[in-house]
Design a protein with these regions (language model features):
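C-terminal binding/interaction regions
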Residues: 119-120, 128
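Active-site-adjacent structural patch at catalytic or cofactor/ligand-binding sites
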Residues: 19-81, 131-136
Length: 165
């Protein structure tokens, strides 16, 4: 009985993502006086690999160039965690997070960089305990302007250097 209860609890991780996405109230960003720069948020994520049903644990770095709408800083993490709860592949997760951030903010300039460890690499097959997978999705200015891309990647390096351990 205890094992069945635990199994059901672990499966909730996958099912919970089908609950409605958390509300991300947008605020006007008055372009003439508003924030025009890049924002980069670091969010811890946990997911389940849809291929092997093994845990995935990592960090999402979400970059955005402010548009006409802003959302609260915690909303970036809420969106990333909500997207990650669904059983998915890391490559798909990048796109889903970018899509949801674009919807919430109205910005076409979004970058999502994921860095994660996968139970399917650690617990199965090769048993690679130090394996780390990195994936990136860049849209708008993050793709078109090398300076924007560099600023995003430099911000990630700084956050990795100063992140709590």
């Amino acid at each position: 009985y205890e094992m069945n209860t635990r199994l059901v609890g672990s499966e909730r991780c996958i099912r919970d993502s089908y609950n409605p996405m958390p509300n991300a109230t947008a605020f006007p960003n008055h372009i003439e006086n508003g924030y025009k720069g890049m924002l980069v948020v670091r969010s811890e994520i946990k997911s389940v690999c849809s291929h092997h049903h093994q845990p995935v644990s990592g960090v999402a770095y979400i970059g955005i160039i402010a548009a006409e709408q802003l959302i609260g800083l915690s909303k970036y993490t809420r969106i990333a965690q909500w997207c990650a709860r669904r059983g998915t592949l890391q490559e798909e997760l990048n796109n889903v997070i970018a899509d949801e951030i674009q919807k919430a903010t109205g910005s076409s300039n979004v970058g999502v960089y994921l860095q994660a460890t996968h139970g399917c690499c650690e617990n199965r097959g090769i048993g690679a305990h130090s394996s780390l997978t990195q994936t990136t999705v860049l849209r708008g200015a993050f793709t078109e302007d090398m300076g924007t891309k560099k600023e995003f990647m430099d911000n990630i390096k700084l956050q990795q250097e100063f992140a709590p351990r």
